[in-house]
Amino acid sequence: MATDLAMSAELPNSPLAIEYVNDFDLMKFEIKKEPPEADRYCHRLPPGSLSSTPISTPCSSVPSSPSFCAPSPGSQPGQNLVNGVNNNNNNSGNGNNNTQGSSGKPQMEDLYWIPNYQHHISPEALNLTPEDAVEALIGNAHHHHHHHHHQPYEGFRGQQYVGEDLSAATNGHHHPVHHHHHHHGHHAHARLEDRFSDEQLVSMTVRELNRQLRGFSKEEVIRLKQKRRTLKNRGYAQSCRYKRVQQRHMLESEKCTLQSQVEQLKQDVARLIKERDLYKEKYEKLASRAFNGGGNTRDPSSGNHVKTTSTDFFM
């Protein structure tokens, strides 16, 4: 903070310098996609410059702040950037009242938003437009002015948060680094879990699931596929248990039916045995009666005749 105050005291209050800074329009610059090895050139300062802004490098999407000792090349159209910075600082509260003068001119500290830009953020991986980059820089500069330390900008999020509003970070809603990543990871996991129901995960084909999971991180995809595999194994186990129970019930019912049939057959056998015994007893009675009757009526003269009669009876 003492360094910032010393720099602001040494900087001139020249109207030409202020006008030169106000005339810068970042909307006409595009985000350049460069290899990551160009990061080592991001933090070099131009020799002889009073500004603490790093030199414009391929890894930066905005030009460097001009030196206040250089003359103004002329007026250029547009003052949108500094006006946005001033409006943002005026709406944020009374934190900047101690550093603003009574003359109504924009403070020099408000113009130093570029040094606060975090160069480790890679804009080409976020599909950001120049308007989003300007909003991010304005919000990040305001946050650093109040808290005096670097914190991540909430607007820079992963590919899976493209649909969310990037302007939420300009309202001062900042959190610590570990809370930031923890909450975002939890919300992403919850959103991915809630996107598919259990029935959809089980019934969906692998090709359709892979098509739906494009754009999500590898860990979340692996976690969701593990959940799908667990649900399918659980469903298969339940199906096997249901089939076993159903088969057991069917076998038990068939066993009961066969046992009843066996009992019926046993009863039939017992009844037939009883009938057989009755017929056998009747036969023995009739046989004994016929034998006794034939023996009493037989005489010597007609023995052959009686014998023939007995034989005819049995026939």
Curated annotation (Swiss-Prot):
SMART domains tied to this protein: BRLZ
UniProt subcellular location: Nucleus
Residue segments, region Disordered: 52-108, 169-191, 290-315
Species for this entry: Danio rerio
GO cellular component: nucleus
Region (Leucine-zipper): 251-272
Function in brief: Transcription factor, possibly involved in transcription regulation during lens development, including that of crystallin genes. Specifically binds to the alphaCE2 enhancer element of crystallin gene.
Composition bias, Polar residues: 298-315
A GO BP entry: regulation of transcription by RNA polymerase II
Main location: nucleus
Annotated stretches, region: Interaction with DNA: 229-243
GO molecular function: DNA-binding transcription factor activity, RNA polymerase II-specific; RNA polymerase II cis-regulatory region sequence-specific DNA binding; sequence-specific DNA binding
Protein name according to UniProt: Transcription factor MafAa
Biased composition (Low complexity): 52-104
Residue ranges, compositional bias (Basic residues): 172-189
Cross-referenced Pfam families: bZIP_Maf, Maf_N
Sequence ranges assigned to domain bZIP in this UniProt record: 223-286
Signal peptide from the UniProt entry: none
